[in-house]
C-alpha cells in the first residue's frame, strides 16, 4: 500500500488520530519511549542545545503524534504526510493547544531544504520502493545531522503478535494496516540506509511490558525497534 491508496486509507481514519482507544492508540502508548530515544540521540549529537531550535522534519507525520512533543521540547518542527485529512487533523489539534508546527500535505520529493533531524516512525513498513524512499530521506538531512527510523522486525513473533494479535484478535490496529512481508530485519534496514552516506549509531528494541502496561526501550528486537543514524561528516 503506497501513494494514493495509502493516502486514501489513512484519510478514512483521520478522525481517530487523537481519539481515546482509537485506531492509533498503540502509537500514543509507544510515543514516550520513542521520544526518549529521540532526546537521547539528539543530546548526543547536539549537546549544546538539544532539541531547542533544532530544525526537524517528521515524514509520515499523520495527526502529529510525534511532532507535538518535539515542538513542546523547543524544536522547530515540520510534518509532512500524503493524507490531506491527517494533515487537517494535525493542524486542528496543534491550533487547539497553541503549538507552532508547520504541517504540509506533500511528498518527500517536494521538500527542497535540509534539516538537523529527520524522523520517520512506523512508516517504512508501508513503503513499496523502499530504497528510493530512503535515498530521498537522506537527502533532507544536513551533514552531521540525524535520521531516526522505527519499524517492525520480520519475525514469527511479529506476525503472531503484530498482525494476528493486534489486528484480528485484540483489534487494537485496523485490519489490513500491515503487510508482514514488508517488515524489515534490522540488518536489512541498516544496510539500505548506510548505502546513502549514513552511519548507524544506535539500535534499540521497543517492547511492551504487560506488568507495567507501557512501552520501554531495550530488550529484544523481535518485534518493534528504533534505529538512529548520523549523516557522515566528510573529511
Give the positions of each predicted feature.
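Acceptor-substrate binding/catalytic loop of class I
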Residues: 151, 171-188
Amino acid at each position: 500500500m503506497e501513494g494514493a491508496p495509502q493516502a486514501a486509507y489513512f484519510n478514512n481514519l483521520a478522525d481517530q488520530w487523537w481519539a481515546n482507544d482509537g485506531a492509533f492508540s498503540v502509537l500514543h502508548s509507544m510515543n514516550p519511549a520513542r521520544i526518549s530515544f529521540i532526546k537521547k540521540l539528539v543530546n548526543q549529537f547536539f549537546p549544546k542545545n538539544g532539541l531547542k531550535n533544532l530544525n526537524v522534519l517528521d515524514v509520515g507525520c499523520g495527526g502529529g503524534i510525534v511532532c507535538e512533543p518535539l515542538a513542546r521540547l523547543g524544536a522547530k518542527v515540520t510534518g509532512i504526510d500524503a493524507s490531506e485529512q491527517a494533515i487537517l487533523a494535525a493542524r486542528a489539534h496543534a491550533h487547539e493547544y497553541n503549538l507552532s508546527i508547520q504541517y504540509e500535505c506533500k511528498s518527500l520529493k517536494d521538500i527542497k531544504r535540509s534539516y538537523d533531524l529527520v524522523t520517520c516512525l512506523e512508516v517504512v513498513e508501508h513503503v513499496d520502493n523502499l530504497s528510493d524512499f530512503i535515498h530521498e530521506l537522506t537527502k533532507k538531512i544536513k551533514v552531521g545531522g540525524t535520521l531516526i527510523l522505527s519499524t517492525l522486525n520480520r519475525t514469527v513473533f511479529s506476525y503472531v503478535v503484530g498482525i494476528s494479535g493486534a489486528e484480528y484478535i485484540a483489534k487494537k490496529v485496523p485490519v489490513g494496516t500491515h503487510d508482514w512481508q514488508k517488515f524489515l530485519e534490522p540488518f536489512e534496514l541498516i544496510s539500505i540506509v548506510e548505502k546513502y552516506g549514513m552511519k548507524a549509531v544506535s539500535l534499540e528494541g521497543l517492547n511492551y511490558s504487560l506488568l507495567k502496561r507501557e512501552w520501554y526501550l531495550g530488550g529484544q528486537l523481535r518485534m518493534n525497534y528504533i534505529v538512529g543514524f548520523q549523516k557522515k561528516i566528510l573529511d
